[in-house]
A protein has these predicted regions:
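Active-site-proximal beta-alpha loop/turn segments in soluble metabolic enzymes
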Residues: 2-12, 39-46
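Auxiliary Fe-S-binding modules of radical SAM enzymes
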Residues: 25-148
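Conserved mixed alpha/beta catalytic, RNA-binding, or beta-rich assembly cores of soluble enzyme
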Residues: 4-7, 15, 33, 71
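Active-site glycine- and acidic-residue-rich loops that bind
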Residues: 6-20, 76-83
């Protein structure tokens, strides 16, 4: 089972994040998805600021300490906030990357938020570029099952 939180949602404060930490603790999840809020132009939150990179990284680190074996993705949303966001997520404690392998001409049909990070390459090229970026920070991609 999995669960997660969006960091920096409009109206969210630190007390809410602490409540989320404690709430998630009850589930003993196998995967926890944590990513920053990023506004989409077609929503009531279009003019809102995105969530904080630093707070998202702190929460990744906290969840890693609380759940040493959990599958913890470094999200595309982190890479949308900063070019090295995905790598920073890994360094903060994430252990999963989920590259966008959709063909570039199809990606606009699935738009969760504006300016979504993409390596802009074909699926195989994008995976190779991601592997190279992670190698620079001392990690490698395993294509094995990521069982809990």
């Amino acid at each position: 089972q999995g669960t997660g939180i969006m960091v920096g949602s409009p109206g969210q404060n630190t007390d809410h994040l602490v409540e989320d930490l404690l709430f998630i603790e009850q589930f003993h999840p196998e995967m926890i998805g944590i990513g920053p809020f990023i506004p989409h132009h077609d929503t009531p939150f279009a003019a809102c600021l995105p969530g904080s990179m630093e707070m998202t990284l702190k929460l990744l680190s906290i969840f890693r300490l609380m759940h040493p074996k959990v599958l913890l993705p470094s999200t595309t949303a982190l890479a949308t906030l900063a070019p090295d966001g995905r790598e920073r997520g890994i360094l903060a404690g994430a252990n999963v990357v989920m590259p966008n392998l959709s063909p570039p001409e199809q990606r606009n049909k699935y738009s969760l938020y504006d300016n979504k990070a993409s390596l802009g390459a074909e699926a195989a090229e994008g995976l190779q570029q991601l592997e190279e970026k992670l190698t620079v920070i001392g990690y490698r991609i395993s294509k094995e099952r990521g069982d809990y």
